[in-house]
Structures are given as C-alpha cells and as structure tokens.
C-alpha cells in the first residue's frame, strides 16, 4: 500500500508505475492536444474574411493528426519465431558448457544447430531493428537496401558456419581455442 502525503492511499502500485500523474491527481484530466491558441489567434486576425471557408476545412489539430501506420513487426509471426529461437538457445548454450567442464566432445550436429540458431536469432533481431529505425513508409529504398544487406550477410555467415563445421571442429571448439593462452594451434579458415 503506497501513501502519498495529503492524499488517499493507493492500493495498487501498477497505477503509479503506468501513469504516475493520474495516480497522484486522480480527478485531473490532461489533454494531449497541442495548444495553438496564440498562433490561431494571429491567423484569425489576419484572415477575418475567410471565416466561411475555414468551417468547411478541417481544423489544424485534425489536419496535423496522422494515425499510426501498420508496422510489419507488430502482429506478425516474426516475433513468435524470434521468441522460439531465443528460448531454443538456452539449452543449446548449456550443453557446450557442460561438455567443456567435463572434458567431453560436443556432437557436430549440436554444434551446427547452436551456431545456425544463433545466426537466425541475430537475423530476426536485426530485422526488427531495421523495421523500427528505417521504416518502409519513410525510407523505402534504404529499408530495402538494409534488408538486402542483412540477408546477404546472413547467407555469408551461413556459408562461414558451413566452412567452420566441415573444415574445422566447429564453433564451440573455435571458442575453446580462442580462450586458450597458447594460440599456436589455432587454425581459422586456412590461417596458421
């Protein structure tokens, strides 16, 4: 139970967290419209003759309001797939830690699935960043270019995972070798 000085007690803290102004002043009604009183007054003094025409047009606050555009990321399956990839990574990262502590060798199929699901998770995360910060409605060419670059980088990374799994011992073994102090035995893509 939260108490505000001089006001009634608030039983539910979620109202304070969600909207602290309404929690402190429950009877206060705040308007979210911008006030153009001084600007409209100047315009009204300058355009006295156009009073009949302005009633037919929409007011300035209605003209300025634009409903939010539909987002590609909202209500799509991409969020669900990203969540599935995120929760799949939890057990897949625990198994290599267990294998490294016990001295065992990790299965190559498990190593390939760990690295490819990690790549899928990163690709979904970067796709959502592109959708949020380079909107298709505002920057159509840059949005498409960013997505093509992301897909190209993902395909190149998938080829790198294939090379790592077939020519080396895999992603987990590479990380294990990178954490070792002696790097004489480190072999990455044809370099000694």
From Swiss-Prot:
Keyword Isomerase: no
Disruption phenotype: Although cells lacking TIM18 live well and do not display any strong phenotype, they do not survive in the absence of mitochondrial DNA.
Localization (cell): Mitochondrion inner membrane
Mitochondrial matrix side: 43-88, 135-144
Family matches, as Pfam families: CybS
GO biological process, one term: response to osmotic stress
Transmembrane segments annotated in the record for this chain: 89-109, 114-134, 145-165
Keywords from the named record: Membrane, Mitochondrion, Mitochondrion inner membrane, Protein transport, Transit peptide, Translocation, Transmembrane, Transmembrane helix, Transport
Additional information: Present with 4440 molecules/cell in log phase SD medium.
Family: Belongs to the CybS family.
Protein function: Component of the TIM22 complex, a complex that mediates the import and insertion of multi-pass transmembrane proteins into the mitochondrial inner membrane. The TIM22 complex forms a twin-pore translocase that uses the membrane potential as external driving force. Its role in the complex is unclear but it may be involved in the assembly and stabilization of the TIM22 complex.
Protein name, UniProt field: Mitochondrial import inner membrane translocase subunit TIM18
Gene from which this protein is expressed: TIM18
């Amino acid at each position: 139970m939260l108490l505000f000085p001089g006001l009634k007690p608030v039983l539910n803290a979620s109202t304070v967290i969600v909207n602290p102004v309404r929690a402190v002043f429950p009877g206060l009604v705040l308007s979210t419209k911008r006030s153009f009183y001084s600007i409209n007054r100047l315009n009204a003094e300058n355009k006295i003759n156009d009073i009949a025409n302005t009633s037919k047009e929409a007011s300035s606050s209605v003209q300025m309001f634009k409903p939010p555009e539909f987002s590609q990321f909202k209500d799509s399956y991409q969020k669900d797939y990203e969540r599935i990839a995120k929760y799949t990574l939890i057990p897949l990262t625990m198994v290599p830690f267990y294998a490294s502590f016990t001295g065992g060798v990790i299965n190559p199929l498990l190593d390939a699935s760990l690295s490819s699901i990690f790549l899928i998770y990163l690709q979904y995360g970067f796709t959502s960043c592109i959708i949020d910060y380079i909107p298709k409605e505002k920057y159509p060419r840059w949005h498409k270019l960013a997505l093509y670059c992301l897909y190209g980088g993902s395909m190149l990374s998938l080829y790198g995972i294939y090379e790592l799994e077939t020519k080396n011992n895999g992603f987990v073994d590479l990380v294990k070798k990178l954490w070792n102090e002696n790097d004489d035995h480190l072999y990455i893509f044809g370099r000694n």
